[in-house]
Structure formats: C-alpha cells, structure tokens
C-alpha cells in the first residue's frame, strides 16, 4: 500500500507542477485535491506500519 501511495503522490506532484505552470490550468484544483488525498494516505500508511513494528522496505 505504501508503494501505491508513493506512486500516486508522485503523479499528483507532476500534475500539480503542470497545472500550476499554466500548461493545464484547469487541472490545478484536481491536482491539489489528489495531492492532499495521497499525502494523507502516505501518512496513514506510515503510521500503521510503525504501529505494527515494521520498518519501510528498502
């Protein structure tokens, strides 16, 4: 799950850069929403893994 959260976080960051750069100004609000959703999923995933006692896979 952490892998998916990181993947979608990267996709959201790329969409945000394109949206805020003027290339796709209509997608900026969608990129903001996606970014914060997957940022929250990343934090939740890190907390759950920490509580289970497992460290991140390297």
UniProtKB/Swiss-Prot annotation:
Keywords of the record: Cell membrane, Membrane, Transmembrane, Transmembrane helix
Q: How does it sit in the membrane?
A: Multi-pass membrane protein
Q: Does the keyword Transcription regulation apply?
A: no
Q: Which residues cross the membrane?
A: 4-24, 28-48
What cellular component GO annotations does this protein have? plasma membrane
What S-S linkages are listed for this chain? none
Identify its protein family.
Belongs to the UPF0391 family.
Descriptive protein name: UPF0391 membrane protein ABO_0024
Species of provenance: Alcanivorax borkumensis (strain ATCC 700651 / DSM 11573 / NCIMB 13689 / SK2)
């Amino acid at each position: 799950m952490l892998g998916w959260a990181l993947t979608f976080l990267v996709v959201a960051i790329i969409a945000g850069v394109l949206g805020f750069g003027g290339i796709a100004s209509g997608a900026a609000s969608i990129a903001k929403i996606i970014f914060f959703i997957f940022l929250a999923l990343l934090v939740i995933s890190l907390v759950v893994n920490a509580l289970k006692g497992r460290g991140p896979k390297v």
